């Protein structure tokens, strides 16, 4: 039920009423659990994802007039999970093998060059390779001959460019499992303290406050950098490395308010402050352009957000008809978003002399390369730090006023309406309204309906977030995934202006909903049904990744169009970007759905009963109307279709419409047997569609419109609780007791995929990324951690 007319931005689909603890006494819970699954630890079995959590709560009275103070603390430590398969692609090439032998003899081959075609040590490198290659015992005679006959580095590059993974793994005493990614939930340690307090000052006035502080330290992983990849400096990591992304997250919030009465009105004056900061540290990594001089840990920067709201609210009941409730008030909101840059080496690309690359890029003869001449990427591998051009400190404010009325026309008929006006400093005004009615048709049957308009202001993060990260795209020649530096440009950047991205404006909604509740008291049965329809215009999307304009594209134009493309090249180069994405008001959507909840309770005898809850929902969102394409010189002419496809690609459409289950249902049965209770819950998650393209019909080919579909699954949870006495309760249970996993990624890779609206073919992408993503990394019905077993002790005194 939309509530933007009452509460403002983000309440398009309603709000949640959170009741904070205010009880007295001491209570807590200690819980331990983990994923006991056949697929734990990369399908080795056992247990992973262990969680140990302690919750404590204490409440006491405050003053002598009914005040209270309640505080809650939580400490938790969660281990990571991983569900990666055994890597099945190339890991080592022949150069890696020769490099290993040379290293065993005290020679670091890769330290002898920065740029393989621009090094004074070419003869030395050639001689070392010819000296140590014969010691690689598994090279064939033909391979040894090719190496021995090579008289130049280019000839050696050709002679050493073949896969030796299986033999080299054996020589190094390793297995393919040693090169697995970590695919699953991250490691997490957290501590939280929150409070809720109220202090009556007199009979009509009370002071209240609530808030808290939390800290979370996360440890997740990026893609494994293999030793045969250009992003790996084998001088530092001879077997490649798995970058770790460490996060430090602080959240702080506090509210202070005063309630009283004035001229018959209940008055609430309050201020709320909330902050969040997210710092990144990248460990077990390297800046490949620094070679052996690279650190292994980087401060990659920080993002932070602050919001302060100040509210004055009035409400009063009037003796009109069967009762009129009038509420009105005002709000002032201030928001601030910051990005702090990381250390230089976390984002910079260096040349072979250790100088930072200019905005125009590194000259070919000065670029740092691997042995085969591939340019090495800059910045900390796994997560590139925020750059100086990413740094931002932006704020905005808004003023709002609202009125909300509810009139009981008769004892069985209520009508209500609300109107809210807001003025934002960055995009202007918005006015939203709501009408609703509730009819008590019979004592046990209620019908309601509502219609409302709403909005969602573009967040400061959507407007000003800027970052460059490593993403993987299919090589149009080899079909293999290769890293590209992708930049998110701000909405107000020069790059966005050149592409034609307009300034962000609010999303606007119109919605209607209706529903009924029906009770049969004699049968302890209640039924609730709700249906809804929401239309959202100007929905904010993240565009696909645009490629940097090539010199050929620039030279094919003239005049203003050519200058625009040159300026766009400069914008890319200033951020070391090869691809770029933008936030834009790009589409309109419609969402329709229905929710059904049926609750029943049956009492067998004193202390023995069963309560059953059946809930089901169907929800479908789809894009409607035309794309809101920017009109610029860049998207004109024959490239228009391709430009539109990049603006909102097929994968984004699937994410929007089919990436979450349309149908969900659950049946919970809670059997109470005196001090013992048993909970059995069955949940069904409907099918989902992966945005990746693959050969679904097994004809050997695929198109960008051909996607795998993962079928619906039934998940069963069970728990048994025992109330030992009034102070102690014990619970054991298992979520997903059947250890049910989603359907696996397709294992066959088609010959090619038609990857454009014109169905131009190119080599296909392996959706499993060499068997690392056994399950989809793009969609999730219910998670991929399998069975979770736990035990919990609850206590109160």
Question: Where is each model-derived feature located?
Answer:
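A beta-strand signature from Gram-negative outer-membrane beta-barrel systems
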Residues: 1-29
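Repeated loop/turn-to-beta-strand initiation elements of outer-membrane beta-barrel proteins
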Residues: 24-26, 66-69, 204-207, 264-267, ...
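Gram-negative outer-membrane beta-barrel transporters
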Residues: 328, 531-694
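C-terminal beta-signal and adjacent terminal beta-strands/loops
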Residues: 536-537, 620-623, 683-696, 721-797
């Amino acid at each position: 039920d939309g509530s933007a007319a009452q509460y403002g931005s983000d309440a398009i689909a309603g709000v949640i009423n959170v009741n904070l603890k205010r009880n007295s006494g001491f209570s807590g819970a200690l819980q331990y659990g983990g994923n006991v699954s056949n697929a734990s630890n990369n399908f080795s079995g056992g247990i992973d994802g262990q969680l140990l959590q302690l919750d404590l709560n204490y409440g006491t009275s405050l003053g002598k007039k009914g005040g209270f103070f309640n505080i809650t603390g939580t400490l938790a430590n969660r281990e990571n999970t991983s569900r990666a398969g055994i890597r099945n692609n190339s890991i080592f090439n022949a150069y890696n093998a020769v490099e290993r032998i040379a290293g065993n003899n005290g020679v670091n081959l890769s330290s002898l060059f920065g740029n393989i075609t621009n090094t004074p040590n070419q003869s030395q490198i050639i001689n070392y390779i010819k000296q140590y290659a014969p010691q690689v015992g598994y090279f064939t005679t033909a391979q040894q001959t090719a190496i021995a006959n090579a008289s130049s580095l280019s000839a050696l590059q050709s002679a050493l460019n073949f896969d030796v993974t299986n033999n080299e793994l054996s020589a190094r005493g390793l297995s393919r499992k040693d090169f697995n990614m970590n695919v699953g939930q991250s490691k997490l340690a957290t501590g939280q303290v929150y409070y809720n307090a109220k202090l009556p000052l007199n009979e009509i006035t009370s002071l209240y406050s609530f808030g808290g502080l939390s800290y979370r330290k996360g440890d997740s992983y990026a893609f494994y950098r293999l030793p045969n990849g250009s992003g790996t400096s084998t001088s530092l990591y001879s077997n490649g490395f798995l970058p770790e992304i460490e996060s430090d997250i602080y959240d702080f919030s506090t509210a202070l308010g005063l309630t009283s009465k004035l001229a018959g009105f209940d008055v609430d004056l309050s201020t709320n402050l909330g902050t969040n900061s997210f710092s990144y540290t990248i460990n077990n990594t390297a800046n490949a352009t620094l070679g052996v001089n690279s650190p292994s840990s980087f401060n990659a920067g920080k993002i932070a957000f602050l919001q302060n709201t100040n509210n004055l609210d009035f409400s009063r009941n009037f003796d009109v008809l069967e009762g009129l409730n009038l509420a009105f008030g005002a709000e002032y909101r201030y928001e601030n978003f910051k990005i702090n840059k990381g250390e230089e080496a976390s984002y910079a690309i260096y040349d072979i002399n250790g100088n930072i690359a200019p905005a125009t890029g590194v000259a070919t003869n000065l670029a740092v390369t691997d042995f085969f001449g591939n340019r090495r990427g800059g910045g900390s591998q796994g997560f590139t730090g925020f750059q100086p051009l990413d740094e931002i400190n932006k704020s905005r404010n808004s003023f709002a006023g609202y009125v909300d009325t509810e009139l009981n026309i008769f004892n069985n008929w209520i009508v209500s309406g609300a109107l809210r006006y807001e003025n934002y400093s960055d995009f202007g005004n918005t006015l939203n309204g709501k009408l609703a009615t509730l009819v008590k048709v019979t004592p046990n049957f209620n019908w309601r309906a509502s219609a409302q308009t709403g909005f969602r202001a573009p967040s400061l993060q959507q407007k000003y977030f800027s970052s460059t990260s490593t993403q993987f795209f299919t090589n149009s020649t080899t079909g293999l995934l290769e890293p590209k530096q992708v930049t998110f440009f701000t909405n107000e950047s020069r790059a966005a202006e050149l592409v034609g991205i307009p300034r962000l404006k609010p999303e606007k909604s119109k919605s209607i909903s209706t529903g009924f509740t029906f009770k049969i008291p004699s049968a302890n049965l209640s039924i609730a049904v709700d249906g809804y329809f929401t239309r959202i215009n100007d929905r904010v999307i993240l565009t696909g990744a645009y490629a940097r304009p090539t010199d050929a594209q620039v030279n094919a134009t003239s005049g203003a169009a050519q200058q625009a493309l040159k300026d766009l090249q400069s914008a890319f180069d200033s951020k070391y970007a090869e691809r770029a994405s933008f936030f834009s008001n790009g589409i309109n959507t419609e969402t329709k759905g229905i929710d059904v909840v049926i609750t029943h309770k049956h009492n067998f005898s004193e202390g023995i009963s069963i309560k059953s809850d059946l809930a089901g929902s169907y929800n479908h969102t789809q894009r409607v109307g035309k794309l809101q394409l920017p009109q610029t010189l860049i998207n004109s002419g024959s490239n228009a279709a391709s430009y539109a496809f990049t603006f909102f690609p097929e994968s984004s459409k699937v994410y929007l419409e089919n990436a979450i289950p349309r149908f969900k249902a659950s049946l919970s049965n809670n059997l109470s047997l005196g001090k013992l209770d048993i909970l059995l819950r069955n949940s069904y998650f409907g099918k989902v569609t992966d945005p990746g393209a693959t050969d679904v019909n097994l004809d050997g080919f695929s198109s960008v419109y051909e996607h795998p579909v993962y079928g619906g699954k039934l998940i069963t949870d069970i728990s048994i609780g025992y109330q030992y006495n009034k102070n102690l309760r014990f619970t054991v249970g298992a979520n997903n007791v059947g250890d049910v996993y989603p359907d696996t990624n397709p294992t066959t890779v088609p010959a090619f995929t038609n990857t454009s609206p014109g169905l131009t073919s190119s080599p296909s992408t392996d959706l499993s990324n060499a068997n690392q993503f056994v399950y989809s990394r793009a969609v999730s019905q219910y998670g991929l951690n399998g069975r979770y077993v736990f035990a919990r002790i609850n206590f109160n005194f």
